[in-house]
């Protein structure tokens, strides 16, 4: 059973398509999906994305990290600083390590998964936060409906990383998927 969030969801989908006999179930949290339609941003979010591009071009990892916390932890339409304390510190620490790491390189196993989701026959669950980007919420709903044995669940009050904000709920959902796979 593979569990993946965001880009990890893309990797899990690719693995399920490339190696179906090795995958018994999927839990996808706000997954990126190769081949999915390009995001269309409403004006307010377009401004945030433009700002992110400017910050990334400047190259300051601390500024990039802080703004990514704003987008992915707080949620793009939520007040900045919505999530505080240990959760925010954990995000900044983990994401800071990733930002300072050497580039990982390109995936050699990338698959145009969006057009092939109906080939995935294992029990699958898609989770997303109600404070995540609108296009990610919509894509998550689409993925859940396109997977033959998929279910979809919005997590109220979470953004892009519900496993950080609501670990008990996410863990319970994973256990539900494990039970579906065992049954």
Task: Please state what every model-predicted region is.
Residues 17-21, 142-145, 172, 176:
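Short, well-ordered alpha-helices that flank and scaffold nucleotide-derived cofactor binding pockets
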Residues 13-18, 22-57:
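Flexible "cap/lid" loop of the alpha/beta hydrolase fold
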Residues 2-4, 29:
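Short beta-strand immediately N-terminal to the catalytic nucleophile in serine-hydrolase-like folds
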Residues 148-183:
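Catalytic active-site module of serine/aspartate enzymes centered on a nucleophile-bearing elbow/loop
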């Amino acid at each position: 059973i593979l569990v993946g969030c965001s880009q990890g969801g893309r990797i899990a989908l690719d693995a399920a398509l490339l190696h179906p006999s090795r995958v018994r179930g999927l839990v996808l949290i706000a997954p990126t999906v190769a081949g999915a339609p390009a995001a269309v941003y409403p004006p307010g979010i377009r401004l945030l994305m433009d700002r992110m591009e400017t910050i990334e071009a400047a190259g300051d990892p601390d500024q990039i990290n802080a703004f990514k916390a704003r987008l992915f932890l707080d949620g793009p339409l939520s007040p900045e600083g919505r999530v505080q304390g240990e959760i925010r510190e954990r995000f900044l620490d983990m994401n800071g390590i990733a930002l300072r790491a050497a580039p990982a390189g390109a995936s050699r196993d990338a698959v145009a998964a969006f057009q092939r989701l109906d080939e995935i026959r294992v029990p699958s669950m898609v989770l997303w936060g109600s404070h995540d980007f609108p296009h990610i919420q919509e894509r998550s709903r689409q993925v859940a409906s396109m997977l033959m044995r998929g279910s979809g669940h919005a997590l109220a009050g979470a953004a892009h990383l519900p496993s950080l904000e609501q670990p008990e709920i996410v863990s319970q959902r994973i256990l539900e998927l494990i039970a579906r796979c065992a049954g």
